[in-house]
């Protein structure tokens, strides 16, 4: 099953000084050969956070972050998933999962993972409740 890497996993992989770099690297070494994916949202998030001095102790320019992302996505097993899931689709139960403003993007990424037959891999422990459906793996 292809793993859609959440922005926090991409950041941890791309930045050796990140607190979760070792955990992300271990996961990537063990499971990336099964396939891993990015989307426009996760790629833009990587560039945005990597180039934001108020978030990253050591930040870079957007151009360098894009080059880093290009190097990562050239690694074996990568697939780019177009974002072709409208936010308004789904049942009332799916919409109820968007419990607050912090869950909007999370729920959309989970919907993308479902659309492409994959799962979302994240460090966000708040998404553990979604893990029972097999759509989320919390590292």
From Swiss-Prot:
Q: What are its cofactors?
A: Mg(2+)
Instruction: Tell me where it mainly resides.
Output: secreted
Which residues make up the binding site for Mg(2+)?
Answer: 6, 106
- Matches recorded under CDD domains: PIN_MtVapC25_VapC33-like
Is the keyword Endoplasmic reticulum in the record?
no
What domain of life does the UniProt record list for this protein's source? Bacteria
Sorted alphabetically, the keyword list is: Hydrolase, Magnesium, Metal-binding, Nuclease, Secreted, Toxin-antitoxin system
Q: Where is the PINc domain?
A: 4-133
**Where is this protein found?**
Secreted
Q: What does the entry list under GO cellular component?
A: extracellular region
Pfam family of the protein (one): PIN
Give the SUPFAM superfamilies listed for this entry. PIN domain-like (SSF88723)
What does this protein do, in the record's words?
Answer: Toxic component of a type II toxin-antitoxin (TA) system. An RNase. Upon expression in M.smegmatis inhibits colony formation. Its toxic effect is neutralized by coexpression with cognate antitoxin VapB39.
Under HAMAP family, the record lists:
VapC_Nob1 (MF_00265)
In the record, the note on similarity to other proteins reads: Belongs to the PINc/VapC protein family.
What is the name of the protein in this document?
Ribonuclease VapC39
UniProt gene name: vapC39
């Amino acid at each position: 099953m292809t793993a859609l890497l959440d922005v926090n996993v991409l950041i941890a992989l791309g930045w050796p000084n990140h607190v979760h770099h070792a955990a992300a690297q271990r996961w990537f070494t063990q499971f990336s050969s099964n396939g891993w994916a990015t989307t426009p949202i996760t790629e833009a998030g990587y560039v945005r956070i990597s180039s934001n001095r108020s978030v990253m102790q050591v930040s870079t320019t957007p151009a360098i972050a894009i080059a880093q992302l290009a190097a990562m996505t050239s690694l074996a097993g990568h697939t780019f998933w177009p974002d072709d899931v409208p936010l308004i689709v789904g049942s009332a139960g799916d919409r109820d999962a968007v419990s607050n403003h912090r869950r909007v993007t999370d729920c959309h990424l989970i919907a993308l993972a479902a659309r492409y037959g994959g799962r979302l891999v994240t460090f966000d422990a708040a998404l553990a409740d979604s893990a029972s459906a097999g759509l989320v793996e919390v590292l």
